[in-house]
Amino acid sequence: MASKQAKRKEVHRINSAHGSDKSKDLYHFGSNVPPGSFEQKKGKFPIWPEWSEADINAEKWDAGKGGKEKDKTAKSPIFHFFEDPEGKIELPQSLKVFSWKRPQDFIFSRTPVVVKNEITFDLFSPNEHLLCSELMRWIISEIYAVWKIFNGGILSNYHKGNLGELPILPWKPWEHIYSLCKAVKGHVPLFNSYGKYVVKLYWMGCWRKITVDDFLPFDEENNLLLPATSYEFELWPMLLSKAIIKLANVDVHVAHRRELGELTVIHALTGWLPEVIPLHPAYVDRVWELLKEILPEFKLTEEPSSESKITTIDNKLKEATKENKDGKDGKNGKDLKDGKDMKDGKDGKDGKDGKDGKDGKDEKADARDLGKKNKKDGEKEKEKFKFSLHGSRPSSDVQYSMQSLSECSSAIQLPHMVVYATFTPLYLFENKIFSLEKMANSAEKLREYGLSHICSHPVLVTRSRSCPLVSPPKPPPLPAWKLIRHKKETVITDEAQDAVPKKPEQFLEISSPFLNYRMTPFTIPTETHFVQSVIKKGTPLGSSLPPLVENDLVASTSQGEMSIVNGNQSQGNIALQITLGKDEPSEPALADFHQLEATSLDRDLISLTTATLDKSQEELAINEGVAKEIWLDFEDFCVCFHHIYIFHKPHSYCLNFQKSEFKFVEERVPYYLFVDSLKPIELLVCFSALVRWGESGALTKDSPPVEPGLLTAEAITWKSLKPLSVVLRIHTYATKASVVRLPAGRHMLLFNAYSPVGHAIHVCSMTTFVIGDEDIVLPNFEPESYRFTEQSIIIMKAIGNVIANFKDKGKLPAALRDLQAAHYPIPLNNKELTAQHFRVFHISLWRLMKKSQVAKPPSNFKFAFRAMVFDTDLLDSFSEDVSLAEWVDLKYSTPINEKEYTSEEIAAAVKIQSMWKGCYVRLLMKARKPETKENVTVADTLQKIWAVLEMNLEQYALSLLRLMFKSKCKSMESYPCYQDEETKLAFADHTVNYADQPPNSWFIVFREIFLVPQDMIILPKVYTTLPICILHVINNDTLEQVPKVFQKVVPFLYTKNKKGYTFVAEAYTGDTFVSGARWKLRLIGSYNPLPFLARDSPCNTFSIKEIRDYYIPNDRKILFRYSIKVTVAQSITIQVRTSKPDTFIKLQVLESEEVITSTVGKGQAVIPAFYFLGNEKALSSQSSKQVLLSHPSPKKDPEVLTKKKSGQPGQKSFKGRSGGGLTDTGMPLLEEEILNIPTLEENSSTPQQCYKYIIQCLVLFNSWPLNETQLTFVQALKDMEKMDIKEKHEEPAPMGSPDSHAVSEGQKSVGVPKTTRKGKEKSAEKEKLAKEKQAPRFEPQQVQMPTAVHSQQEDPNKPYWILRLVSEHTDSDYVDVKKDTERADEIRAMKQAWETTEPGRAIKAAQARLKYLTQFIKKPVTTDTTTSAPSPETLSVSQSQTKSSEEGELDTGKYADIKELPPNAAGSVLWKKWQMTKTITSLTKFTSSESVPKEEPPQKEIPVVRQRSPTILETSPQQIRKALEFLDFSHYVRKTAAEAVLQTEELNKQQAMQKAEEIHQFRQHRSRILSIRDIDQEERFKQKDEVLEMYGEMRDSVDEARQKILDIREVYRNKLLEAERLRMEALAAQEAAVKIEIEKKSPASDSQKKKKVGKKK
């Protein structure tokens, strides 16, 4: 059963994993084996399998039972213990292994156990000899951190309550170990005497099963080199550490600098994802805000109790006493329990007792933090690991509770996070001076807080604080009488009073077991600050005068050993005094009072806490472990640490995606991601990379470079090949995570993962996302985005609100305003654009309403709509047939008047129209006014329309907004959802199947015409397993190809055309056999409808016609010319390939010798599709094809039509002809042509257009030179072809053109002449020879191929080429391809006609040529009587015939395929010709070297050989050589000197040096001229800039002067206005005074009058 489970589990492994035969390790059995004995490490081993509880339950833990252990321990079956098949672990270099022992070899007191104490453990005190190793410090620190995170609060409550029952701990480190137990919750591993243990750790994206043995390393002093607890017989730390070290050995790090790379033990123990954030001085403020969000925050209560103060001081005093007492830091941190009371009194944080109680020590650090304001340096080398389990928990909950960790309440709770921080060791051999500076600053600051830079280790960041630890005492209330007209104190001084900025309270609490380890913290005074002191100068005691407040310059004197009480008190006083001195007016006497009061209070507290110093350390450190806490100023925190890590719990996120791949290939794996949200998006992306396997993790100088794994994320859009932005880039050797933050909306991301061995990707988010292959993700981009849907529904609901309140007088104006705000959210500040926007909205709404009315709309439908939108001209100026986008672009155009009207008529028409329009507008206004009859009618009509729309509100809303977006109005860009249009897409797939293909074959996979219904951007993508597949897209109207980048078609704007676009896919199999499979073309566009096929289904059966021949160089550089005629119009693909892969060729299609289309290629050239118009016969049965031929005859029309039909695949199955199938000369063809002449004449009488197409290929840039072997082969090939042609055309009868289309094109037609008797007698022999030599060896071959199977083996040493014509299988019978020999046949027939009409013409021409040559030929002088020079007659005749032959051949040199040979081709003729070839070639080289300074290329030699006449070949080569020796070339030689000089090597060198000197002088002169030009240009630019600057300064000066004048004017004006105002006020006051005086006088006078009257009475 175990073996079956092992085989089943092996699915997750990689059998081809890398491994290395590591060096032998020390293997010591107690004292029985000498230290020098070694054991070879095991070889390759598979990657650790994924965790499976079924495998653990079926595991065999003893020896020899089951095949699993036998396979793994195949080394020595005689041992009765388990030995790790992966070999011994590799310890860091700081730990020297001397021997390996099993637990039975060094534990004698009792039987070893895996777990002894399940409540507490001590990994610090027993392992001080291991703390020199960075790896061991990390393991110990991170085990403590995870223990504190999960179990800190539970154990604190347990020890405080002294409960009898043991608490249930959420996490136990020994539960990662399995031995002799089942995989159940809460299992306890047992000691296994066999030595086999299984450890469960998280690695490469999942939990892994890691098997270890119980061999433990020891050094020479017999010290265990793995962490252990205080119980020496407890094994779980050693076993767990061995598995962790296995993971560390896979990681990559630099030897002699670090002992571990990017591995994090917390990630291995918990599976949480580490996010790396470097601390850079530029954005430390953002880091503080992030930490404040994540970490629990320490807060002060309004009234802290005195009991909490006493308890806090108690703990701090004890801590300080213990630190001075002994250096055993392992026990110093265990006295943190009683400090919980202070926390309870301050925060009311229930679950954080254990953590808050540690504030006693942290307050001590706080006193030191107060006076430190160090500058922040750039930090990059230290790593910070942040564990903030608290992302969404309330700030009152300070303790990490497992309950909050384990719960993931969907979208209500935010993810849990934990903050961690580390610093790297001090490396003195660092080459970068900036790194050394950072290390020095960090080491100095760490020492102030009791940490050592040498002992690098991770620290846990637990809390943040933005307030003092102890709340300052409140000032006594001021008496009410002092609050009346309270004046600020006046300070008499002549110095400027500068406000001292107050440093913000920013502190972080860290927890570390290495705090104050073997060192005493101290503070280095680096800055000064002002401390206010109250000094009464010149005043006697008891004086009531206010004292003077001065600032004395005092250095920071707070010491690390200072009591935390004094530190807190001084901190509180300073903060209070600064506040009072700067902001609040207060009397100095109050400050004195507060200071004295605080001092007396502190003395009382100290006296109260001294009694607690006698308590034992055990009572104060109940199960708090060795971890201690301290508060750090955030500014100092940024100096000490360079990176922070935030560990995210993945299960606290709503959505998780995980994918792992192990492939030993260096290729990037793409992942597409879709996300859409109405709120900002956060994606947590974790990437794990395995860059190598089975090798040591340390990198030395001799190690090969190892590239890290790479994960990139790009925001892409299918409309562009360039990504919009790179949003993420992760380089790692182990595991790293990062948060991708995206704005609200829809996004398309492309992840590319690269790792040599394997990788794992993990994506978490609280927002819904889809990630995977393109087929999985693309369908999510078809629906409208969330923002688009929301915007459309808002608009539609606003329309419904208007319709519902159309009869309500009070609500209708508000509803109309809401509708305008919905569809016109942002003012455009452009009247024309705003008017266009409203018109677009009204037309879109009209189209939607009209479309929604399935039944007959109401009679007043249009009137009701106009009343609602209040637009009378809209529907009249808009045509229903015109698209909205076209209507937007159109401007109002004046109508064309067919006749001219008089001014009176125009005025009358305008008056009538204005009257009717005014009446209609008044009617609309009345309909919009509630409580009118018209309004009720319109409202009822609108209600009926809305009832239809409301049934499918969302669909109609999307249609409305989509209509508006299709208008392409610029105002649509103001909508927020417009940004989502970049990712809006629709796609359609078209698939075909292809058959099996042999190696090195080319074939067509797909060829179809697509019709584009509307202008849109389209991206075609090909999905296939073919090694090479290229897609071509051709516009059938213009015959232009859509541009490609790296052989891929780019997104392109496809405009609507008449003949559509042809999509052609060509493929090449390469060196391997390709089996048949499915090929898919995907068209991606913005919206439907997408381009569609011109027929129902695509064609996948094609016929390939192959033509092979050899390259024969010629003067015109023509590779070949073939004429092609099609009976039925069809599309054909043309491909040419050459044997020389770097030859530049140009493939052309000619119609009537005019280039219709062409393409240039290197080694091959392809015309993807060309539509050939057919010459259909009168009795053609292809009636369906005749429709396609009914096109006009002008030349341009066939050209355009060619492109349209090229999309329809046309295949051809040719009738293969053996031998001379491509040679269209000979008697059989002539006879057939003679029989067909009457038919052609009948056809020519019809008005049908006859199309003549030529396929021509040219060699460019002389890019196909031939070597000697190839030249010899080509020469022999030409000679044999000449013999064949001579045999076929030996008779003097004239020959007409073998091609029937030559007659139909109107060229000169040659009749059949009367043949001579000799020709008639030799006709029978000719037919016989034609049958015998039907297929010469070097004859080009024409092969009909259903597929691209080669008919003969290709010889790469011969210059051959292949022409392929691909048509649809059904149309292949209607294609005829022939070699184009029309011009050669015409020349040959012309010569024959001349000879027939004028006999002896050839002889006369030969005599004339002889006469010309005799002028330059001298008779050779020779004494040899046996050998005589040729007679003049013989030589003249031969040379005249040679000249005649050359004249004819020069005319035909354009067509190198037509050649002539002598009539008597005997067996020895070929040998003679080969000899003559060598002779004339050497002669040509010699002659050209003397006459022409530049030697002609080898291609020029070949026509000379071909132009020799048969008469010369019959002459002896010696005679020709002697005759040519006496040729007079003197008049061809150009003399440049008076006397001839011998051309020697010295002369050549001298001339070369002169030439080089001239070139050098010219180059110097040229460079001088160019430099002068550059200088002049720079001066001109400089002068131009100076002129612009001068005018700019003049403008600025004028503006400044104008502004000064205006300012002076304004001041003067204000002064006058002020004076006028004062004068008016004075006058008003004067008048008021006068009036008062008058009023005072008038009552007095009245009273006096009354008194007088009374007296009179």
UniProtKB/Swiss-Prot annotation:
Pfam families: Androglobin_II (PF22068), Androglobin_IV (PF22069), Androglobin_V (PF22070), Peptidase_C2 (PF00648). Heme b binds at residues 791, 823. Keywords: Cell projection, Cilium, Coiled coil, Differentiation, Flagellum, Heme, Iron, Metal-binding, Spermatogenesis. Disruption phenotype: Adgb knockout males display infertility, reduced testis weight, impaired maturation of elongating spermatids, abnormal sperm shape and ultrastructural defects in microtubule and mitochondrial organization. Females display no fertility issues. Epididymal sperm display multiple flagellar malformations including coiled, bifid or shortened flagella, and erratic acrosomal development. The spermatids are not able to move to the lumen and enter the epididymis to undergo further maturation. A high rate of apoptotic events might further aggravate the decrease of sperm. Residues 1-40, 321-398, 1184-1226, 1288-1356, 1422-1459, 1638-1657 are annotated as: Disordered. Residues 321-386, 1321-1336 have a biased composition (Basic and acidic residues). GO terms for biological process: proteolysis; spermatid development; spermatogenesis. It comes from the Eukaryota. One of its GO terms (molecular function) is metal ion binding. Strongly expressed in testis and lung. Weakly expressed in heart, brain, spleen, kidney and tongue. Residues 1585-1640 form a coiled coil. Transmembrane segments: none annotated. The keyword Iron applies. Gene3D superfamilies: Globins. Residues 1341-1351, 1422-1443 have a biased composition (Polar residues). It is found in: Cell projection, Cilium, Flagellum. One of its GO terms (cellular component) is sperm flagellum. Residues 70-402 form the Calpain catalytic domain. Residues 762-889, 935-967 form the Globin domain. In the central section; belongs to the globin family. Probable chimeric globin with a bis-histidyl six-coordinate heme-iron atom through which it could bind dioxygen, carbon monoxide and nitric oxide. Required for sperm flagellum formation and maturation of elongating spermatids, thus playing an essential role in male fertility. The globin domain is circularly permuted. The globin domain, which normally consists of eight consecutive alpha-helices from A (N-terminal) to H (C-terminal), is circularly permutated and split into two parts. The part containing helices A and B is shifted C-terminally and is separated from the main globin sequence (helices C-H) by a potential calmodulin-binding IQ domain. This is Androglobin. It comes from Mus musculus. The gene is Adgb.
